[in-house]
Amino acid sequence: MILSIESSCDDSSLALTRIEDAKLIAHFKISQEKHHSSYGGVVPELASRLHAENLPLLLERIKISLNKDFSKLKAIAITNQPGLSVTLIEGLMMAKALSLSLNLPLILEDHLRGHVYSLFINEKQTCMPLSVLLVSGGHSLILEVRDYEDIKIVATSLDDSFGESFDKVSKMLDLGYPGGPIVEKLALDYAHPNEPLMFPVPLKNSPNLAFSFSGLKNAVRLEVEKNAPNLNEKIKQKIGYHFQSAAIEHLIQQTKRYFKIKRPKIFGIVGGASQNLALRKAFENLCVEFDCKLVLAPLEFCSDNAAMIGRSSLEAYQKKRFVPLEKANISPRTLLKSFE
């Protein structure tokens, strides 16, 4: 089995993945959302301290799953990029300590690659090549995935990420953090879902394949300020619905542009923001239009987790992509290549 560790942002997670058949044997996670909610976003120093508390607790649960028989482990895998440096280092220190004390090889995993492999948790076979939309609090990307070692970024955000824009809109409406499920509920509760969009769809006439949410976010801010004296629940629902609809339509328009160029046969959607049901439905329709198979990460494995890191690290294990402890380090940025 491989013991995998995830600590790139505000989720502490450990998992055990069986090498022979890619089955997830154990998965434990502690979220920090309640600790960061009053700040309207993740506070790096607080997140680091909480990882230092939570990771050892999760390791104790792993020990129980193993019946304290560490001979079942064949490798230690850790997310080392991208993410918050102060949280990545907490996971890396644990991974190095385990690797050294148990005399096990160390695997360093890219967090974005891990999200791609969330599509294949509990599955030995993958369906590569495929294209993938990754939407989260930190990223909005289209990836072309040929195999484990050949993943390229073909589109990214020029400013805010999809998930980050939901957090900021929720904060404008004084509704808390994380904003994704809060704004999604506003949209679901809105009583007039078929009216024309009140906010502009970003980059609608741009020739570039990219994402941008700053202009949409600013349009929401102006609407909130205009309604500030009477910002009741109905107005918040209307703003939430129209913001979410414009944000998803932006993703659809840009992905449709990509589809027309590349015509992928298989398209995956991953990342924490891919839990949004309206987004999933919109992409189901898009993939039907282009006769493209849609694959979705299970809802429980959309947000950051060690299970996806364990699944991706199986590929590294088979290729013997191990890293000496003295060369193991972290990076706040991904080293995946971008198309020029």
UniProtKB/Swiss-Prot annotation:
<dbReference type="InterPro" id="IPR000905">
    <property type="entry name" value="Gcp-like_dom"/>
</dbReference>
<dbReference type="GO" id="GO:0002949">
    <property type="term" value="P:tRNA threonylcarbamoyladenosine modification"/>
</dbReference>
<dbReference type="GO" id="GO:0005737">
    <property type="term" value="C:cytoplasm"/>
</dbReference>
<keyword id="KW-0408">Iron</keyword>
<feature type="binding site">
    <location>
        <begin position="134"/>
        <end position="138"/>
    </location>
    <ligand>
        <name>substrate</name>
    </ligand>
</feature>
<protein>
    <recommendedName>
        <fullName>tRNA N6-adenosine threonylcarbamoyltransferase</fullName>
        <ecNumber>2.3.1.234</ecNumber>
    </recommendedName>
</protein>
<dbReference type="InterPro" id="IPR017860">
    <property type="entry name" value="Peptidase_M22_CS"/>
</dbReference>
<keyword id="KW-0963">Cytoplasm</keyword>
<keyword id="KW-0819">tRNA processing</keyword>
<dbReference type="InterPro" id="IPR043129">
    <property type="entry name" value="ATPase_NBD"/>
</dbReference>
<comment type="similarity">
    <text>Belongs to the KAE1 / TsaD family.</text>
</comment>
<dbReference type="InterPro" id="IPR017861">
    <property type="entry name" value="KAE1/TsaD"/>
</dbReference>
<feature type="binding site">
    <location>
        <position position="180"/>
    </location>
    <ligand>
        <name>substrate</name>
    </ligand>
</feature>
<dbReference type="InterPro" id="IPR022450">
    <property type="entry name" value="TsaD"/>
</dbReference>
<dbReference type="Pfam" id="PF00814">
    <property type="entry name" value="TsaD"/>
</dbReference>
<feature type="binding site">
    <location>
        <position position="115"/>
    </location>
    <ligand>
        <name>Fe cation</name>
    </ligand>
</feature>
<keyword id="KW-0479">Metal-binding</keyword>
<keyword id="KW-0808">Transferase</keyword>
<dbReference type="GO" id="GO:0005506">
    <property type="term" value="F:iron ion binding"/>
</dbReference>
<feature type="binding site">
    <location>
        <position position="276"/>
    </location>
    <ligand>
        <name>substrate</name>
    </ligand>
</feature>
<comment type="function">
    <text>Required for the formation of a threonylcarbamoyl group on adenosine at position 37 (t(6)A37) in tRNAs that read codons beginning with adenine. Is involved in the transfer of the threonylcarbamoyl moiety of threonylcarbamoyl-AMP (TC-AMP) to the N6 group of A37, together with TsaE and TsaB. TsaD likely plays a direct catalytic role in this reaction.</text>
</comment>
<keyword id="KW-0012">Acyltransferase</keyword>
<feature type="binding site">
    <location>
        <position position="111"/>
    </location>
    <ligand>
        <name>Fe cation</name>
    </ligand>
</feature>
<dbReference type="GO" id="GO:0061711">
    <property type="term" value="F:N(6)-L-threonylcarbamoyladenine synthase activity"/>
</dbReference>
<feature type="binding site">
    <location>
        <position position="304"/>
    </location>
    <ligand>
        <name>Fe cation</name>
    </ligand>
</feature>
<feature type="binding site">
    <location>
        <position position="167"/>
    </location>
    <ligand>
        <name>substrate</name>
    </ligand>
</feature>
